């Protein structure tokens, strides 16, 4: 080969050392870069190369025959690649090349007179394979926690494909580098969908659950496998390097968070102390200058009988918003005397002034004051009413409960009171009268009575009017005098142990076709489900607080009903498990609950490991009772079985 006359080399070159004007090389600049300076041009160094070709090296012929041969080889490469993908094997350039050479009955590509890069399909496969190999090495090397799911998602995003199979390299789990970095997933069919973020979150949960600093990798992976419902940790497809570093980072982050919260709480406490000290000083100033106070706005709607009295008292003001105890007693006493005088003057009158309130109003939540009683009016009454005015027949009470029980269930207390007053025409057409009634009902003691009544009616909803239970029908041959505590056993002044009496408004009857029954059906399924969910939540929080870091408490029905014969699983560090079934109620007198056949069989199977947690729900707290090993408790007589007759049954009247 020979260079050009000016010492440069031609850019043209034969692909495989063929003859030509040059062998390909670098063309130096012949013009100076800086035009303001004169640079002395030096003569290029000439190199004389052998122009004689190696006759033993076969050179490809790029004529028509060569193109046909390349097309045939390219087609063989594509067919081989498709067959490997269909078989579920990994696709690599080496494997495809060897298979194509075997099909063409050639030992090497040199014997065919071409290179591997000359085949378009093979060249594209080599480029893609090298890119994927480099990406996997860098991705795994740069991350301490890597999952197969993360790796597949990253490769697909980098190559703009939907899944790894679209690359035409076979399954991801069959890739040689995947088997190198994740050797335990060789028998898996698909990677588990778990991200590195989930691994870190589970590591945080693991540290909170067991409260340990020295985390063992195998134990933590077992914890992750159980959380993801995977049969073994080997199938997770998770690679973790330097686990201790992540544990340290999480602990440092929690420590910093605690310090920040401590600073914020300290600032809030200081601010609260400042506000409290200011309020105490204001209260001290108010109490030191206490005078009698009458609110004019609260009596704007009263009748004209008190206008003169309000004018006389208008000169009394106070810096304290509440009356003193002596003034309140004085006002209540004068109001009582005024009403008694009106009662004596209008005994035969139907005027509503009999029950009209004076200027001293009831305040919600006011402190109870003891009112002294004089000797001359010790037996007097504020209201001129008889005991007969407060009597209510059993039928009327039953009608009232059946009328308003749905309203109590659906409406709030304020809307319920409004509907109640409107239904019995107690609201009145006058605005002043409506405001008076609303104010009275929303104040003590009436507001307390309303809430008590609403709670009782709501309780009757869940129990399906528990007063319909007949004592003699609870258990055959069961004496009520020695029975366990139940709603039927609650104190009742109208019954005795010797005579069976139906509770409340149900009368005793010898007609067995209309006898009272214990209702346990799902008439109020929505409310029962809500109570059950609340009871499970309370029991879950109780056991979590009780065991702390000593055991792991799992709520199986937290997101949806599983149908299992238990609601909670308590697993200690030794691997022992306890199964807790929660039974919840809002009734203080309900000491029974339903138990399915599956639950009873499971209780018999687990024995001491099966616990019934009975939760009595209250307004602000709950009472939890545990019963362990139901079968043994039944054998020892501590529990009783209750058999209910079906609602549809064949009955025969027998005369005697």
Swiss-Prot record:
Taxonomic superkingdom: Eukaryota
InterPro entries: Auxin_embryo_med, NOV_C
Biased composition (Basic residues): 354-371
Pfam families for this protein: NOV_C (PF13020)
Region (Disordered): 283-375
Lineage start: Eukaryota, Viridiplantae, Streptophyta, Embryophyta, Tracheophyta
Compositional bias per record (Basic and acidic residues), positions renumbered to this chain: 342-353
Name this protein carries in UniProt: Protein NO VEIN-LIKE
Biased composition (Acidic residues): 299-308
PANTHER family in UniProt: PROTEIN NO VEIN, WU:FJ29H11
Gene encoding the protein: NVL
